[in-house]
């Protein structure tokens, strides 16, 4: 969901993960907060992941006034390929598509990589810790 365009939708994936009626919204602005809340009420949503631009303090504060809590912030890095080219591939690390036989090893890497990770799911005290951990390894 891009942050430039307002979108809201039910989130069956999060509902399955946590057994809570869930939705996701992106591109949230102060003007869209009432519409977003109406959507949640209409659909019985009690767990909403809402994203707004970090520079849009008005949107964040409007959500806080409605009882929302800030769980995390995200930073996206970009690189202009016009200003500097991608470095040449030195073939030091082989890259290939994952095979079905790799499944257990990939899960093991994910489990180790996200051990003690604290994401926005973990920041919500209503959510069971083991289910939060499973989000990053499933």
Language model: regions and residue ranges:
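Short hydrophobic/aromatic beta-strand element in the GNAT-like acyltransferase core
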Residues: 60, 137-138
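Acyl-donor-binding surface of acyltransferase catalytic domains
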Residues: 26-102
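Short, flexible segments with low predicted structural confidence
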Residues: 11-12, 33-35, 77, 111-116
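A structural signal for well-ordered alpha-helical scaffolds and beta->alpha junctions
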Residues: 33, 70, 103, 107, ...
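A short beta-loop-alpha structural element at the N-terminal edge
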Residues: 27-28, 94-119, 129
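Conserved GNAT-fold acetyl-CoA-binding loop/helix
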Residues: 118-137
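STAS-typified acidic loop motif
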Residues: 4-31
């Amino acid at each position: 969901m891009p942050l430039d365009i307002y979108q809201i939708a039910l989130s069956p994936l999060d509902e399955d993960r946590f057994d809570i009626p869930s939705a996701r919204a992106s591109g949230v602005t102060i003007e869209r907060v009432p519409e977003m809340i109406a959507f949640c009420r209409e659909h019985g949503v009690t767990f909403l992941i809402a994203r707004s631009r970090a520079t849009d303090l008005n949107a964040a504060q409007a959500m806080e006034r409605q009882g929302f809590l800030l769980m995390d912030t995200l930073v996206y890095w970009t690189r202009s390929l016009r200003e500097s080219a991608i470095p040449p591939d030195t073939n030091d690390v082989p890259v290939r598509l994952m095979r079905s036989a790799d499944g257990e090893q990939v899960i093991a890497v994910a489990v180790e990589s996200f051990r003690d990770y604290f994401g926005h799911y973990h920041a919500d005290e209503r959510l069971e810790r083991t289910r939060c951990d499973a989000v990053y390894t499933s």
